[in-house]
Each structure stands twice: as structure tokens, then as C-alpha cells.
Design a protein with these regions (language model features):
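Residue-level recognition of short loop/turn positions
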Residues: 2-6, 45, 59-60, 94, ...
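Phosphopantetheine-dependent thiolation modules in NRPS/PKS and related acyl-activating systems
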Residues: 159-172
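Conserved beta-strand termini and adjacent loop/short-helix elements that scaffold enzyme active sites
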Residues: 1, 101-103, 149
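Conserved ATP/PPi-binding loop(s) of AMP-dependent carboxylate-activating enzymes
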Residues: 1-40, 78-80
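AMP-binding/adenylate-forming catalytic core of the ANL superfamily
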Residues: 22, 27-28, 38, 47, ...
Length: 172
């Protein structure tokens, strides 16, 4: 894990770093030097691939993946990793699926929002799900808007459909 692309994250420091993969690393993307320069870097004579994942390292060496840097929500100067919040929302026994994303906000740049679907027969509402999650995060990490939907929007391959989810929250 490299926080600034030049040195390793100190275990137990709480620093967030980019996951870098060494070893057999490609020379670059075909006819895309800009993307190649962002993804493949040489540090101290070794070549690394930076795939976009962010993580921390615990004092015992355990790596905690936080999520994709490109999905990170900057809200009032604080960084929120949606995948981390989604997993916490899904800890509620009634929540079947969840997506968290940023929506534009005049005051904070972005605000955290999300959608959840409830298990069949479940009766939880958005407030109950948020209350159960509140003890796990700082207030800026929690969705300011959380909408309960019949099905969380996903592509046929299971990937999150953030565009559709944002549209649901923008126009409930």
C-alpha cells in the first residue's frame, strides 16, 4: 500500500494508501499512454500496477480494503468509501442489498446518499436501518438520504447501477 505513490503505508498508522501490485506488470494499455501513466508506475526500480483500490494496514499486517478510489465521496473535505458503508448497511438483518453514492451538494461538494432493499417479509424502514448503522461510523459517513426500494439497481452481471440508483433518490 502506497499513500503517495512513493513509500509504503506504516502498519497501524491509520494512513490510507493505494493498493499496488508488483511482479508481472504489463508495460501499459494499448495506444493509451495517459491511462498507462496513471495505472503503471516505477518506484525504486520496481514496476507496479495501481488498480484503484484503497486500503489501510493494521498493526498486525492485516489489510482492510476500503473501496475504489474512483468511488470515494468527498463530503465537506472528508473521504467516504461507499463500499464500506454499503457493507455496514447490509449488517442490518432486514437489509438484502445496498448501494451508497455521492450526490452533488452546494455546501459540502457531495452528500452521501443510498438505496436499500429489504428482505421479503422484512419491515425495517430507512430510519431504522440508519439508526442501527449510526454506531459504526462518523455522521459524515452516513447517508443523508436513504431510500428503501423493492430492488437495488444492478446490471445483469451484478455490478452496481449507480446512475439508476441516483435517479431513484433524486426523483423518489
Amino acid at each position: 500500500l502506497l499513500p503517495d505513490g512513493s513509500r509504503e503505508v506504516v502498519p497501524g498508522s491509520g494512513e490510507v494508501g493505494m493498493v499496488a501490485q508488483g511482479g508481472m506488470v504489463p508495460l501499459g494499455y494499448y495506444k493509451d499512454p495517459e491511462k498507462s501513466a496513471k495505472t503503471f508506475k516505477e518506484i525504486d526500480g520496481k514496476r507496479y500496477a495501481f488498480i484503484g483500490d484503497m486500503a489501510t494496514v493494521e498493526a498486525d499486517g492485516t489489510i482492510n480494503l476500503l473501496g475504489r478510489g474512483s468511488n470515494c465521496i468527498n463530503t465537506g473535505g472528508e473521504k467516504v468509501f461507499p463500499e464500506e458503508v454499503e457493507e455496514a448497511l447490509k449488517l442490518h438483518p432486514a437489509v438484502e442489498d445496498a448501494l451508497v453514492f455521492g450526490l452533488e451538494d452546494e455546501r459540502f461538494g457531495n452528500r452521501v446518499a443510498g438505496v436499500v432493499s429489504i428482505e421479503k417479509g422484512g419491515t425495517a424502514d430507512a430510519d431504522e436501518v440508519l439508526e442501527a448503522t449510526r454506531k459504526l461510523f462518523a455522521s459524515y459517513d452516513l447517508p443523508k438520504e436513504l431510500l428503501v426500494v423493492p430492488v437495488v439497481p444492478r446490471a445483469p452481471n451484478g455490478k452496481a447501477d449507480y446512475k439508476a440508483a441516483k435517479a431513484l433518490v433524486a426523483d423518489p
